[in-house]
Protein backbone atom coordinates (compact mmCIF):
# COMPACT_ATOMS: atom_id res chain seq x y z
CA UNK A 1 0.00 0.00 0.00
CA UNK A 2 2.90 2.37 0.72
CA UNK A 3 4.28 1.70 -2.75
CA UNK A 4 1.01 2.78 -4.38
CA UNK A 5 1.00 6.07 -2.43
CA UNK A 6 4.51 7.10 -3.49
CA UNK A 7 3.58 8.01 -7.11
CA UNK A 8 0.64 10.11 -5.90
CA UNK A 9 2.88 11.98 -3.45
CA UNK A 10 5.44 12.64 -6.18
CA UNK A 11 2.69 14.00 -8.46
CA UNK A 12 1.50 16.30 -5.68
CA UNK A 13 4.99 17.66 -5.14
CA UNK A 14 5.36 18.35 -8.89
CA UNK A 15 2.12 20.36 -8.93
CA UNK A 16 3.30 22.48 -5.98
CA UNK A 17 6.61 23.19 -7.72
CA UNK A 18 4.81 24.27 -10.90
CA UNK A 19 2.52 26.58 -8.92
CA UNK A 20 5.51 28.23 -7.25
CA UNK A 21 7.23 28.73 -10.61
CA UNK A 22 4.10 30.24 -12.20
CA UNK A 23 3.70 32.56 -9.21
CA UNK A 24 7.27 33.79 -9.61
CA UNK A 25 6.77 34.42 -13.35
CA UNK A 26 3.53 36.28 -12.64
CA UNK A 27 5.21 38.54 -10.06
CA UNK A 28 8.08 39.23 -12.47
CA UNK A 29 5.64 40.11 -15.26
CA UNK A 30 3.75 42.51 -12.99
CA UNK A 31 7.00 44.23 -11.97
CA UNK A 32 8.06 44.64 -15.61
CA UNK A 33 4.70 46.19 -16.52
CA UNK A 34 4.92 48.56 -13.57
CA UNK A 35 8.40 49.67 -14.58
CA UNK A 36 7.29 50.33 -18.17
CA UNK A 37 4.11 52.23 -17.33
CA UNK A 38 5.48 54.11 -14.29
CA UNK A 39 9.12 55.00 -14.86
CA UNK A 40 10.88 56.06 -11.66
CA UNK A 41 12.77 59.01 -13.19
CA UNK A 42 10.43 62.01 -13.40
CA UNK A 43 13.04 64.29 -15.00
CA UNK A 44 13.33 61.95 -17.99
CA UNK A 45 9.62 62.57 -18.70
CA UNK A 46 9.66 66.30 -17.98
CA UNK A 47 12.81 67.44 -19.78
CA UNK A 48 12.50 66.79 -23.49
CA UNK A 49 15.77 68.50 -24.33
CA UNK A 50 18.30 69.66 -21.76
CA UNK A 51 20.94 72.37 -21.81
CA UNK A 52 23.19 72.06 -24.85
CA UNK A 53 26.94 71.98 -24.39
CA UNK A 54 29.90 73.10 -26.45
CA UNK A 55 31.52 76.37 -27.38
CA UNK A 56 29.10 77.19 -30.22
CA UNK A 57 26.04 75.57 -28.64
CA UNK A 58 23.10 77.74 -27.72
CA UNK A 59 20.90 77.89 -24.66
CA UNK A 60 18.34 75.16 -25.36
CA UNK A 61 15.83 73.91 -22.77
CA UNK A 62 12.53 72.29 -23.72
CA UNK A 63 10.07 71.24 -21.02
CA UNK A 64 7.12 69.05 -21.94
CA UNK A 65 3.53 70.12 -21.17
CA UNK A 66 3.32 67.46 -18.46
CA UNK A 67 5.87 69.16 -16.22
CA UNK A 68 4.57 70.17 -12.81
CA UNK A 69 5.02 73.72 -11.46
CA UNK A 70 7.67 72.42 -9.07
CA UNK A 71 9.62 70.87 -11.95
CA UNK A 72 9.42 74.08 -13.96
CA UNK A 73 10.72 76.01 -10.98
CA UNK A 74 13.59 73.55 -10.69
CA UNK A 75 14.53 74.18 -14.33
CA UNK A 76 14.05 77.97 -14.23
CA UNK A 77 16.55 80.04 -16.23
CA UNK A 78 18.08 83.28 -15.02
CA UNK A 79 17.75 86.31 -17.23
CA UNK A 80 21.52 86.81 -16.98
CA UNK A 81 22.06 83.39 -18.57
CA UNK A 82 19.85 84.34 -21.51
CA UNK A 83 21.64 87.65 -22.05
CA UNK A 84 25.02 85.95 -21.71
CA UNK A 85 24.15 83.53 -24.53
CA UNK A 86 22.94 86.43 -26.69
CA UNK A 87 26.09 88.44 -25.98
CA UNK A 88 28.20 85.49 -27.12
CA UNK A 89 26.29 85.25 -30.39
CA UNK A 90 24.53 81.99 -29.54
CA UNK A 91 20.90 81.04 -30.22
CA UNK A 92 18.36 80.89 -27.41
CA UNK A 93 15.58 78.31 -27.61
CA UNK A 94 13.38 77.97 -24.52
CA UNK A 95 10.11 76.05 -24.48
CA UNK A 96 7.83 75.93 -21.45
CA UNK A 97 10.50 77.52 -19.25
CA UNK A 98 10.31 80.09 -16.46
CA UNK A 99 12.73 82.99 -16.97
CA UNK A 100 13.64 84.82 -13.77
CA UNK A 101 15.14 88.28 -13.92
CA UNK A 102 15.23 91.03 -16.52
CA UNK A 103 16.38 90.83 -20.13
CA UNK A 104 18.17 94.16 -20.58
CA UNK A 105 19.42 94.57 -24.15
CA UNK A 106 21.04 97.89 -23.29
CA UNK A 107 23.81 95.84 -21.66
CA UNK A 108 24.92 94.45 -25.03
CA UNK A 109 28.07 95.95 -26.50
CA UNK A 110 27.55 98.83 -28.92
CA UNK A 111 28.96 98.27 -32.40
CA UNK A 112 29.54 100.63 -35.27
CA UNK A 113 26.96 100.75 -38.04
CA UNK A 114 29.59 99.95 -40.66
CA UNK A 115 30.36 96.53 -39.18
CA UNK A 116 27.07 94.96 -40.21
CA UNK A 117 26.06 94.84 -43.89
CA UNK A 118 22.82 96.74 -44.32
CA UNK A 119 21.07 97.57 -47.62
CA UNK A 120 21.43 101.22 -48.53
CA UNK A 121 17.69 102.12 -48.47
CA UNK A 122 17.21 100.44 -45.11
CA UNK A 123 20.35 102.03 -43.69
CA UNK A 124 19.22 105.49 -44.80
CA UNK A 125 15.77 104.98 -43.33
CA UNK A 126 17.24 103.65 -40.12
CA UNK A 127 19.66 106.55 -39.72
CA UNK A 128 16.88 109.06 -40.36
CA UNK A 129 14.71 107.48 -37.69
CA UNK A 130 17.37 106.56 -35.17
CA UNK A 131 19.70 109.49 -35.38
CA UNK A 132 22.55 107.49 -33.84
CA UNK A 133 25.58 105.71 -35.21
CA UNK A 134 25.70 102.67 -32.91
CA UNK A 135 23.85 99.41 -32.76
CA UNK A 136 23.45 96.39 -30.54
CA UNK A 137 23.17 93.07 -32.35
CA UNK A 138 21.35 89.82 -31.57
CA UNK A 139 22.98 87.54 -34.15
CA UNK A 140 21.08 84.28 -33.67
CA UNK A 141 17.48 83.20 -33.27
CA UNK A 142 15.67 84.18 -30.08
CA UNK A 143 12.84 81.81 -29.19
CA UNK A 144 10.84 82.01 -25.95
CA UNK A 145 7.82 79.80 -26.63
CA UNK A 146 5.13 78.88 -24.12
CA UNK A 147 7.35 80.33 -21.42
CA UNK A 148 6.81 82.71 -18.52
CA UNK A 149 9.07 85.76 -18.35
CA UNK A 150 8.89 87.24 -14.86
CA UNK A 151 11.22 90.19 -15.44
CA UNK A 152 11.21 93.14 -17.82
CA UNK A 153 12.38 93.03 -21.44
CA UNK A 154 14.03 96.36 -22.23
CA UNK A 155 15.87 98.34 -24.88
CA UNK A 156 15.57 102.02 -24.00
CA UNK A 157 18.58 103.55 -25.68
CA UNK A 158 17.69 106.90 -27.24
CA UNK A 159 20.74 106.91 -29.53
CA UNK A 160 21.36 103.32 -30.70
CA UNK A 161 19.35 100.66 -32.48
CA UNK A 162 18.85 97.00 -31.59
CA UNK A 163 19.21 94.58 -34.51
CA UNK A 164 17.76 91.06 -34.51
CA UNK A 165 19.45 89.16 -37.33
CA UNK A 166 17.58 85.90 -36.67
CA UNK A 167 13.88 85.12 -36.20
CA UNK A 168 12.13 86.12 -32.98
CA UNK A 169 9.45 83.81 -31.59
CA UNK A 170 7.49 84.73 -28.44
CA UNK A 171 4.43 82.64 -29.31
CA UNK A 172 2.15 81.65 -26.41
CA UNK A 173 4.54 83.13 -23.84
CA UNK A 174 3.44 85.14 -20.82
CA UNK A 175 5.24 88.40 -20.05
CA UNK A 176 4.55 89.45 -16.48
CA UNK A 177 6.47 92.74 -16.70
CA UNK A 178 6.81 95.38 -19.39
CA UNK A 179 8.30 94.78 -22.84
CA UNK A 180 10.04 97.67 -24.59
CA UNK A 181 11.90 96.80 -27.79
CA UNK A 182 11.68 100.26 -29.31
CA UNK A 183 14.15 101.28 -32.00
CA UNK A 184 14.63 97.65 -33.03
CA UNK A 185 15.27 96.25 -36.51
CA UNK A 186 13.97 92.73 -37.14
CA UNK A 187 15.55 91.09 -40.19
CA UNK A 188 13.55 87.85 -39.95
CA UNK A 189 10.00 86.94 -38.97
CA UNK A 190 8.51 87.99 -35.64
CA UNK A 191 5.93 85.70 -34.01
CA UNK A 192 3.82 86.99 -31.13
CA UNK A 193 0.74 84.83 -31.69
CA UNK A 194 -0.96 83.65 -28.52
CA UNK A 195 1.38 85.66 -26.30
CA UNK A 196 0.14 87.66 -23.30
CA UNK A 197 1.60 91.03 -22.33
CA UNK A 198 0.34 91.93 -18.87
CA UNK A 199 1.92 95.39 -18.95
CA UNK A 200 3.13 97.71 -21.70
CA UNK A 201 4.33 96.41 -25.07
CA UNK A 202 6.36 99.03 -26.93
CA UNK A 203 7.81 98.62 -30.42
CA UNK A 204 8.21 102.32 -31.22
CA UNK A 205 10.11 103.05 -34.45
CA UNK A 206 10.46 99.34 -35.11
CA UNK A 207 11.37 98.00 -38.53
CA UNK A 208 9.98 94.61 -39.50
CA UNK A 209 11.47 93.19 -42.70
CA UNK A 210 9.50 89.91 -42.69
CA UNK A 211 5.99 88.78 -41.67
CA UNK A 212 4.69 89.57 -38.20
CA UNK A 213 2.21 87.24 -36.50
CA UNK A 214 0.02 88.43 -33.62
CA UNK A 215 -2.98 86.13 -33.89
CA UNK A 216 -4.98 85.95 -30.63
CA UNK A 217 -2.30 87.97 -28.87
CA UNK A 218 -3.39 89.69 -25.65
CA UNK A 219 -1.90 93.13 -25.25
CA UNK A 220 -2.06 94.94 -21.92
CA UNK A 221 -2.78 98.52 -20.83
CA UNK A 222 -0.59 100.20 -23.45
CA UNK A 223 0.62 99.08 -26.88
CA UNK A 224 2.74 101.30 -29.13
CA UNK A 225 4.00 100.81 -32.67
CA UNK A 226 4.41 104.54 -33.33
CA UNK A 227 6.34 105.30 -36.57
CA UNK A 228 7.09 101.64 -37.25
CA UNK A 229 7.54 100.10 -40.71
CA UNK A 230 6.12 96.68 -41.63
CA UNK A 231 7.68 95.48 -44.88
CA UNK A 232 6.14 92.01 -44.54
CA UNK A 233 2.56 90.96 -43.94
CA UNK A 234 0.86 91.52 -40.58
CA UNK A 235 -1.70 89.07 -39.19
CA UNK A 236 -3.38 90.19 -35.96
CA UNK A 237 -6.57 88.18 -36.38
CA UNK A 238 -8.59 88.01 -33.14
CA UNK A 239 -5.98 89.98 -31.20
CA UNK A 240 -7.04 91.74 -28.00
CA UNK A 241 -5.78 95.27 -27.32
CA UNK A 242 -7.03 95.70 -23.79
CA UNK A 243 -5.68 99.24 -23.36
CA UNK A 244 -4.47 102.06 -25.58
CA UNK A 245 -3.37 100.91 -29.05
CA UNK A 246 -1.15 103.36 -30.93
CA UNK A 247 -0.32 102.72 -34.58
CA UNK A 248 0.43 106.35 -35.42
CA UNK A 249 2.36 107.15 -38.61
CA UNK A 250 2.93 103.47 -39.32
CA UNK A 251 3.68 102.11 -42.80
CA UNK A 252 2.10 98.77 -43.77
CA UNK A 253 3.57 97.62 -47.09
CA UNK A 254 2.00 94.15 -47.38
CA UNK A 255 -1.46 92.68 -46.63
CA UNK A 256 -2.58 93.46 -43.11
CA UNK A 257 -5.43 91.98 -41.12
CA UNK A 258 -7.06 92.94 -37.83
CA UNK A 259 -10.14 90.81 -38.43
CA UNK A 260 -12.18 90.05 -35.28
CA UNK A 261 -9.74 92.03 -33.16
CA UNK A 262 -10.95 93.95 -30.11
CA UNK A 263 -9.72 97.40 -29.13
CA UNK A 264 -10.62 98.17 -25.53
CA UNK A 265 -9.57 101.81 -25.14
CA UNK A 266 -8.53 104.60 -27.48
CA UNK A 267 -7.17 103.41 -30.82
CA UNK A 268 -5.08 105.46 -33.21
CA UNK A 269 -4.06 104.77 -36.80
CA UNK A 270 -3.76 108.45 -37.68
CA UNK A 271 -1.16 109.32 -40.28
CA UNK A 272 -0.59 105.68 -41.18
CA UNK A 273 -0.33 104.32 -44.71
CA UNK A 274 -1.71 100.99 -45.87
CA UNK A 275 -0.01 100.27 -49.18
CA UNK A 276 -1.74 96.91 -49.61
CA UNK A 277 -5.00 95.29 -48.61
CA UNK A 278 -6.15 95.83 -45.01
CA UNK A 279 -9.07 94.20 -43.24
CA UNK A 280 -10.82 95.31 -40.06
CA UNK A 281 -13.80 93.04 -40.72
CA UNK A 282 -15.81 92.25 -37.57
CA UNK A 283 -13.36 94.17 -35.41
CA UNK A 284 -14.75 95.91 -32.30
CA UNK A 285 -13.61 99.42 -31.35
CA UNK A 286 -14.95 100.07 -27.86
CA UNK A 287 -13.79 103.68 -27.46
CA UNK A 288 -12.50 106.59 -29.55
CA UNK A 289 -10.93 105.54 -32.85
CA UNK A 290 -8.78 107.73 -35.07
CA UNK A 291 -8.03 107.20 -38.76
CA UNK A 292 -7.37 110.87 -39.50
CA UNK A 293 -4.92 111.53 -42.35
CA UNK A 294 -4.71 107.77 -42.98
CA UNK A 295 -4.06 106.62 -46.56
CA UNK A 296 -5.69 103.43 -47.84
CA UNK A 297 -3.92 102.77 -51.14
CA UNK A 298 -5.60 99.41 -51.77
CA UNK A 299 -8.66 97.53 -50.51
CA UNK A 300 -9.92 98.60 -47.09
CA UNK A 301 -12.49 96.26 -45.53
CA UNK A 302 -14.66 97.31 -42.58
CA UNK A 303 -17.66 95.03 -43.13
CA UNK A 304 -19.13 93.93 -39.81
CA UNK A 305 -16.87 96.19 -37.76
CA UNK A 306 -18.42 97.90 -34.72
CA UNK A 307 -17.47 101.42 -33.63
CA UNK A 308 -18.97 101.84 -30.17
CA UNK A 309 -17.34 105.25 -29.64
CA UNK A 310 -16.49 108.13 -31.93
CA UNK A 311 -14.73 107.33 -35.22
CA UNK A 312 -12.65 110.01 -36.92
CA UNK A 313 -11.80 109.53 -40.61
CA UNK A 314 -11.12 113.22 -41.21
CA UNK A 315 -8.86 113.88 -44.21
CA UNK A 316 -8.35 110.15 -44.73
CA UNK A 317 -7.93 108.94 -48.30
CA UNK A 318 -9.50 105.84 -49.84
CA UNK A 319 -8.05 105.07 -53.27
CA UNK A 320 -10.46 102.19 -53.80
CA UNK A 321 -14.13 101.96 -52.99
CA UNK A 322 -14.65 101.49 -49.24
CA UNK A 323 -17.35 99.52 -47.43
CA UNK A 324 -17.84 101.79 -44.41
CA UNK A 325 -21.58 101.53 -45.03
CA UNK A 326 -21.39 97.89 -43.92
CA UNK A 327 -19.89 98.80 -40.54
CA UNK A 328 -21.88 99.74 -37.46
CA UNK A 329 -21.35 103.22 -36.01
CA UNK A 330 -23.01 104.13 -32.72
CA UNK A 331 -22.10 107.73 -33.53
CA UNK A 332 -21.94 109.21 -37.04
CA UNK A 333 -18.34 108.96 -38.28
CA UNK A 334 -16.38 112.14 -38.88
CA UNK A 335 -15.64 112.37 -42.60
CA UNK A 336 -14.50 115.98 -42.92
CA UNK A 337 -12.45 116.38 -46.12
CA UNK A 338 -12.24 112.61 -46.48
CA UNK A 339 -11.33 111.51 -50.00
CA UNK A 340 -13.46 108.52 -50.93
CA UNK A 341 -13.17 106.64 -54.17
CA UNK A 342 -16.10 107.03 -56.55
CA UNK A 343 -16.48 104.72 -59.56
CA UNK A 344 -15.91 106.56 -62.82
CA UNK A 345 -19.08 107.37 -64.74
CA UNK A 346 -19.31 106.00 -68.31
CA UNK A 347 -18.00 108.59 -70.73
CA UNK A 348 -19.49 109.62 -74.10
CA UNK A 349 -22.46 111.65 -75.20
CA UNK A 350 -24.68 108.61 -75.55
CA UNK A 351 -24.10 107.67 -71.91
CA UNK A 352 -25.45 110.93 -70.44
CA UNK A 353 -29.10 111.05 -69.42
CA UNK A 354 -30.01 114.18 -71.42
CA UNK A 355 -28.62 112.75 -74.62
CA UNK A 356 -30.46 109.49 -74.01
CA UNK A 357 -33.74 111.41 -73.71
CA UNK A 358 -32.93 113.38 -76.86
CA UNK A 359 -32.09 110.25 -78.81
CA UNK A 360 -35.37 108.65 -77.74
CA UNK A 361 -37.40 111.66 -78.90
CA UNK A 362 -35.54 111.74 -82.22
CA UNK A 363 -36.25 108.06 -82.85
CA UNK A 364 -39.93 108.57 -82.01
CA UNK A 365 -40.11 111.49 -84.44
CA UNK A 366 -38.49 109.46 -87.21
CA UNK A 367 -40.91 106.62 -86.54
CA UNK A 368 -43.86 109.03 -86.77
CA UNK A 369 -42.63 110.40 -90.10
CA UNK A 370 -42.24 106.91 -91.49
CA UNK A 371 -45.81 106.05 -90.46
CA UNK A 372 -47.16 109.23 -92.09
CA UNK A 373 -45.22 108.53 -95.27
CA UNK A 374 -46.58 104.99 -95.41
CA UNK A 375 -50.17 106.29 -95.05
CA UNK A 376 -49.74 108.70 -97.98
CA UNK A 377 -48.45 105.95 -100.21
CA UNK A 378 -51.66 104.04 -99.65
Annotate the PLM regions:
Residues 26-37:
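Bacterial N-terminal signal peptides
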Residues 4-11, 17-27:
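Bacterial N-terminal signal peptides that target proteins for export
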Residues 17-20, 349, 372:
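General helical secondary-structure elements
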Residues 365-376:
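Alpha-helical transmembrane segments
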Residues 2, 16-19, 275, 378:
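Intrinsically disordered, low-complexity polyampholyte segments enriched for Lys and acidic residues
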Residues 39-358, 364:
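N-terminal leader/targeting and pre-domain segments
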Amino acid sequence: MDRTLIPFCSFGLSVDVLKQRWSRWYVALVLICAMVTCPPEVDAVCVAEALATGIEAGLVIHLSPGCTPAEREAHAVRGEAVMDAIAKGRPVDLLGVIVRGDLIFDHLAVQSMSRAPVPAPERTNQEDRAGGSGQRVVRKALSLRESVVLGAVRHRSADDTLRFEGPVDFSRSHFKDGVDLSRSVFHESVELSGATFEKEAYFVQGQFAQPVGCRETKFGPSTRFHRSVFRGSVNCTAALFDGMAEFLEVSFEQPTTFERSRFGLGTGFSGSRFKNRVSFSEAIFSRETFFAFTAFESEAEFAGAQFLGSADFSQAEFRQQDDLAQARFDQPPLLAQTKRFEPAQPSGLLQTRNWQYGLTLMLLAVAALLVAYAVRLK
